[in-house]
Amino acid sequence: EGSDKYNHDLIVDNHKYKKIEVKTKRRKYDPRPDWQVSIAKTSKHQNPDLYIFTSITFGRHIGEGRDRIYYEPKSIWITGQMQPKEYFAKARLCQKGKPDPDRRGRTNDFETHVEMYNMNIEDLEPLDVSLLPQKQ
């Protein structure tokens, strides 16, 4: 309600995680456990109860960087979840314009456009299945 509707992707009634923010990465390949999820520092104001991380694998793209446009979605992955306090305590802050190394120090040479808090997919919690629609 009000301005709060711009800070969360989902509102779940009667659940311990009421306000949920979904963070999505677009990819050329299906995600691997040692790949990363990200939250931009500029998104910290959202203050959800839970983050859910997803990846969409696309068949092709044109352009590079911020100008990249993706086509032919092939698959959608729910890669995990985490509560904000735990996420920001464990995540690595990647500076704007620098490659974003994983926790092992490897990089995919992607330079961040803004400061990002990154974490490996393998360090996330699995999705709480009680968040999924239940059969009536």
Predicted regions, residues:
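Nucleic-acid endonuclease domains
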Residues: 1-18, 23-136
